[in-house]
């Protein structure tokens, strides 16, 4: 079962000037971590990628993590699921079908993430898919992706995150 695992994914949002912004999976890790280890992993990933936002599911250990990381000054946002995992995954499939999701071929974790996505929801694990659907829904609902042309074009530069990492990953990437 996947309940024993915690997963962390890091995303970059980038535009090419020809359409709505795309997303690149910049990092993924999962494990069975006790709370102090989970907290340190979250801080380490923040230091590694310097994201503008950290999204944490507000249940189980996530509640304590939200409080601790906010007190540490990190840019925390809560995610409260309002539907089941399969429904959330279904809600983001158009982003994959439209070729808007990138992932680097050269990273060890890419194969693991892709295998989990391929076998979801009947596979052995769903931890990455849970973080992926939460992140993509949050970015779409928050206006970071799926803008109308008039909205996103004049704000494109403000919405590009982790530009250097995204460009490096994009040069060695494939469409999901």
Show the residue positions of the predicted features.
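Conserved helicase motor
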Residues: 80-86
